[in-house]
Amino acid sequence: MSFGLHPWDVAFRPSPPHNLEKKVVPPGADREKSLPSPKEDSDGAREPDSTVDLRKKNKKKKNYQRYAKPPYSYLAMISLVIQNSPEKRLKLSQILQDISSLFPFFKGNYQGWKDSIRHNLSSNDCFRKVLKDPLKPQAKGNYWTVDVTRIPPDALKLQNTAVTRQDLFPLDLAPYILHGQPYRSLERLSANHTRGRTTPRMEPEVQIPVSDPAVSFPMILWNLPTSYSKCVAPNVVAPPSIHPLLLYSNFPSISIYNYLPPPYGSPVYSDRRDLLASGLHPQIPLTPKPPELKNAPSDFPPNKTVFDIPVYTGHPGFLASQSLFSPHLPTATPPLVGYRPSGL
């Protein structure tokens, strides 16, 4: 007896094509499957969440910066804030608040110093508790006072720490605790200390005396450097752009071209000088120059005697200027007449 295949039999169903059975696997999937998850160790066991969170907390860095601890004992700081209060008594919360406002070290997240304050209040006999309600001695909100006669003298002095070398803290708190002097906060002390170091001292202004032009100009003429001077500045080789006489605005208006020769013996420059002088001061006639100087070619080389100024004694301009400067010119020094340096 043979049994036929029915449509619901497994053998009767045709097998699907092979390309539909394959799944598309991206590259690197086998590698990712082989790697353990971050919460699993090498053995495949899953780590607890508390261990992972602990590692994350340890990796985080502290972003706050703590100030240096004040170089005083807790006894001294408690006595300081109590004595600076108007009523000479404070609650525990007020003591903690005043100490944190005076010293920035206690403003951070560090809370261990509050236990030290409580311990010093209860262990030192110089601090006395004033009950807010005598019927409730165990109630909170009591006041604390300080008996200054029971404070050890050494407890108020500056302790030897690394902050002591910065000179920001007083050496002794006794004047502020025993005599009632006001104590400034550390921020003000550091600001004043920094300002005292960085602010420069103002030097008193030195007033330069202003001399008379009529007196100072002859001295300028006699003290001009020459090529034969011992010390000549590097910028005296070139001719000056302005004559020293023109630096004085209040000087009498006498043309310097009437009695000073040009720096170079050029005939073109000499003719222009004569035209300029005659146009400016027609009332002063020009006289001919001495022949020994007029015909001398190139008496003043550019690199030698730029400031060597000869004076014409017979020129009217020189006579006019001599009448102005005669009280100031030295009498022992003769005028330079046709001076010509030797060796040229």
Curated annotation (Swiss-Prot):
What protein name does the entry list?
Forkhead activin signal transducer 3
Domain observations = The FM region is required for binding smad2/smad4 complexes. FM2 is more effective than FM1 and only interacts with phosphorylated smad2 that is in an activated smad complex.
Fetch the InterPro entries from UniProt: Activin_resp_transcr_regulator, FH_FOXH1, Fork_head_dom, TF_fork_head_CS_2, WH-like_DNA-bd_sf, WH_DNA-bd_sf
DNA-binding region residues: the ranges are: 69-165
Q: Which organism is it from?
A: Xenopus laevis
Q: Where is this motif: SMAD interaction motif (SIM)?
A: 293-316
Pfam families to which the protein is assigned, alphabetical? Forkhead (PF00250)
Give positions of region: SMAD interaction domain (SID).
213-331
- An example of a Gene Ontology BP annotation on this entry? positive regulation of DNA-templated transcription
Motif Fast/FoxH1 motif 1 (FM2), which positions? Answer: 234-240
Which chain regions cross the lipid bilayer?
A: none
Q: What are the alphabetically sorted keywords of the record?
A: Activator, Developmental protein, DNA-binding, Gastrulation, Nucleus, Transcription, Transcription regulation
Grouped into one coarse class, the protein's main location is nucleus
